[in-house]
Amino acid sequence: MTVLSDRDIKRALEEGDIVVKPLEEEYLEEALGPASLDLRLGNEFVVFKTLHKPCIDPTVDAGENTERIVIDEDEEFVINPGELVLAVTHEWIEINAPDITGVLHGRSSLGRLGIQAHVEAGYVDPGWRGRLTLELVNFNPMPVKLRPGMRVVQIVFHRLSSPAERTYAESSGKYHGDERPSPSKMHLDFCRG
């Protein structure tokens, strides 16, 4: 696998191999790094309710343990110490080329505030279409304010050694087409008898 440079990313955007919406020209100049593209925080969050249960069971729909919060673009969202919050990118991403994949990395400026931008879901398969769910965790001993539109992650695009035989879109991925932050759908992996 090779990493796409800024030139390669621009070309892939022009040719429709990668789609990022919205992507204003002036923002592209600010967000495009030598080998990555910064993505912004959306305005929708999912928080976990404190329930009087002994644990979370991955075989059960996690959505019942969550609450969805939508804020205005000019509001702020406070993430407390030790809190896990699901959020969504402002941008809609499509990876249309079967030989391109993406990997999310938290921005170091956010990490230096104690915020981890994604816990595990940092891989974006060929054929992905949707907004990316972020798993934000605050490791700072202080609450941290987050604002919609702030750059929170960068996506690094890689070219595969050969095109994927079956893309994420063709494999009926559980999160394909997401527009909102999605709680775990792991319960769908378990067979019920």
Swiss-Prot record:
GO terms for molecular function: dCTP deaminase (dUMP-forming) activity; dCTP deaminase activity; nucleotide binding. The gene is dcd. DCTP binds at R107, S108, S109, L110, G111, R112, D125, T133, L134, E135, Q154, Y168. InterPro entries: dCTP_deaminase (IPR011962), dUTPase-like_sf (IPR036157), dUTPase_trimeric (IPR033704). The keyword Hydrolase applies. The record marks G122, Y123 as: Important for bifunctional activity. The keyword Iron-sulfur does not apply. Residues 169-193 are annotated as: Disordered. Homotrimer. CDD domains: trimeric_dUTPase. This is dCTP deaminase, dUMP-forming. Keywords: Hydrolase, Nucleotide metabolism, Nucleotide-binding. Pathway: Pyrimidine metabolism; dUMP biosynthesis; dUMP from dCTP: step 1/1. GO terms for biological process: dUMP biosynthetic process; dUTP biosynthetic process; nucleobase-containing small molecule interconversion. The active site is at E135 (proton donor/acceptor). Belongs to the dCTP deaminase family. Bifunctional enzyme that catalyzes both the deamination of dCTP to dUTP and the hydrolysis of dUTP to dUMP without releasing the toxic dUTP intermediate.
